[in-house]
């Protein structure tokens, strides 16, 4: 059995996690838990992995916290109140209405219709 070493750890959007799980399942390392997790992520996915990664990257100019960017790219809120409910996680910063609108505009570019 090979050893696994964690080199880095990052927060990732749901759709990126789904893609990684898909790769593991395709390699033959599937289990009931992995399949159920994949099915759940498939049911809540609002944009593909590539688009979610672009959302995270574009949000970095507005939001410094990686975890907040990952949650936004996972949930894809499209109203100011939804965005604010997530931004509350970042208690060290106050976001303006303009910031919130920029976040919504970025998300809308990539969300599935």
From Swiss-Prot:
GO annotation, cellular component aspect: cytoplasm; DNA-directed RNA polymerase complex
Domain of life: Archaea
SUPFAM superfamilies: HRDC-like
UniProt entry tagged with the keyword ATP-binding: no
Enzyme Commission numbers on file: 2.7.7.6
GO terms for MF: DNA-directed RNA polymerase activity; nucleotide binding
Localization (cell): Cytoplasm
GO biological process: DNA-templated transcription initiation
Catalytic reactions on record: RNA(n) + a ribonucleoside 5'-triphosphate = RNA(n+1) + diphosphate
Keywords: Cytoplasm, DNA-directed RNA polymerase, Nucleotidyltransferase, Transcription, Transferase
PANTHER family reported for this sequence: DNA-DIRECTED RNA POLYMERASE SUBUNIT RPO4, RNA POLYMERASE RPB4
Subunit architecture: Part of the 13-subunit RNA polymerase complex. Forms a stalk with Rpo7 that extends from the main structure.
Described function: DNA-dependent RNA polymerase (RNAP) catalyzes the transcription of DNA into RNA using the four ribonucleoside triphosphates as substrates. The highly mobile Rpo4/Rpo7 heterodimer stalk is conditionally required for transcription initiation.
Cited HAMAP family: RNApol_arch_Rpo4 (MF_00864)
Family: Belongs to the eukaryotic RPB4 RNA polymerase subunit family.
NCBIfam families: PRK14981.1-5
UniProt protein name: DNA-directed RNA polymerase subunit Rpo4
Naturally occurring in which organism (per UniProt): Saccharolobus shibatae (strain ATCC 51178 / DSM 5389 / JCM 8931 / NBRC 15437 / B12) (Sulfolobus shibatae)
Lineage of origin: Archaea, Thermoproteota, Thermoprotei, Sulfolobales, Sulfolobaceae
Annotated gene: rpo4
